[in-house]
């Protein structure tokens, strides 16, 4: 059975890693969709799709990474069309994992099974919070996996975020 998990991953944090592990405990293969892949260098979307892909790959244990595939999911103007666009990008999936009510509704309307992913400490483990902590030179390192931390340091995320 194949599952789909979509997120912006700006950046990929420990809450996202927990969601990936949760999904992998329920499906054989997990398609990870990097949402808003066509956006970067914006305050809300500062990192490129390739940078986010690198964060994900470097954060997932090698023993399970082969059960995942990562796909770029660009934003489209029509929400209803969005789920069908995804079908053109990723292989067949049986279940969608999400914590987003709108995503649940869109896929649910199509009769696709949707499983709610409960994100731990949502306010603390949010991309918005982590980006702000990085910008303010406050401790953010314990909120992201080591792989993400390495990527953020390599690309000088602190300087990028301060300049947006």
For the regions a protein language model found, what residue spans apply to each?
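Nucleotidyltransferase catalytic core that binds NTPs
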Residues: 1-164
